[in-house]
């Protein structure tokens, strides 16, 4: 049995995403924890090494704040670019944390949000393909579709990680923690 742990502020952790079949999908080598509770983990990273399932690696281009919630089937990456904040939202299982990493299952569907507030649902073809290949249960599909709706409401209502104050508060906290280290 895996013992769940709650990451502490200032701690550096790995983030591991998996596919439904249990195979590793992607690993972010280092994210600094800004807030860790039973329900929410908020972290920050910048120029972080990412390893893909096939072994390829790349480095993130900009500072980002990541948001995970234990009750919702999505996570949000807030990326700070010259022309504004972009959001990349992964439809995924709720997160779990253990001594190794923060972990979740990536379910292919993504929502990209632009600085002007417009957003698009991405990768529906990949989702349909993997749903058949990996035999996603029908109730997973229902949960994910419901969470797409919740995510769209959050975006439109500027709730949670889409709230302007969220960005200000957590970006500042990340900058201060980086200065200390």
Swiss-Prot record:
Q: Where does Mg(2+) 1 bind?
A: 90, 106, 110
Q: Which reaction does it catalyse?
A: a ribonucleoside 5'-triphosphate + H2O = a ribonucleoside 5'-diphosphate + phosphate + H(+); a ribonucleoside 5'-diphosphate + H2O = a ribonucleoside 5'-phosphate + phosphate + H(+)
**MF (Gene Ontology):** magnesium ion binding; nucleoside diphosphate phosphatase activity; ribonucleoside triphosphate phosphatase activity
Q: Give the main EC class.
A: hydrolase
Q: What positions constitute the catalytic site?
A: 26 (proton donor)
EC code(s) of this entry: 3.6.1.15, 3.6.1.6
Keywords, comma-separated and alphabetical? Hydrolase, Magnesium, Metal-binding
* Chain residues that bind Mg(2+) 2: 108, 110, 123, 126
- Identify which cofactors the protein needs according to its UniProt entry: Mg(2+)
UniProt keyword Methyltransferase, yes or no: no
Its biological purpose is as follows: Has nucleoside phosphatase activity towards nucleoside triphosphates and nucleoside diphosphates.
| Record family assignment | Belongs to the Ntdp family.
Protein name (record): Nucleoside triphosphate/diphosphate phosphatase
- Recorded source organism is Staphylococcus carnosus (strain TM300)
Organism lineage reads as:
Bacteria, Bacillati, Bacillota, Bacilli, Bacillales
């Amino acid at each position: 049995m895996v013992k769940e742990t709650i990451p502490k502020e200032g701690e550096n952790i790995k983030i591991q995403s998996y596919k439904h079949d249990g195979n590793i999908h992607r690993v972010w080598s280092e994210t600094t924890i800004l807030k860790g509770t039973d329900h929410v983990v908020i972290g920050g990273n910048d120029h972080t090494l990412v390893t893909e399932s096939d072994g390829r690696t790349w480095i993130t281009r900009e500072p980002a704040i990541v948001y995970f919630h234990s009750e919702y089937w999505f996570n949000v990456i807030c990326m700070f670019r010259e022309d504004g904040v972009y959001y990349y939202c992964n439809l995924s299982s709720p997160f779990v944390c253990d001594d190794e990493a923060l972990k979740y299952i990536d379910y292919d569907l993504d929502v990209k949000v632009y600085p002007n507030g417009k957003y698009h649902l991405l990768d529906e073809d990949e989702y349909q393909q993997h749903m058949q290949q990996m035999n996603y249960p029908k109730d997973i599909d229902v949960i994910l579709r419901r969470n797409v709706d919740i995510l769209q409401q959050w975006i439109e209502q500027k709730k949670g990680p889409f709230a302007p104050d969220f960005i200000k508060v957590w970006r500042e906290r990340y900058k201060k923690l980086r200065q200390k280290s």
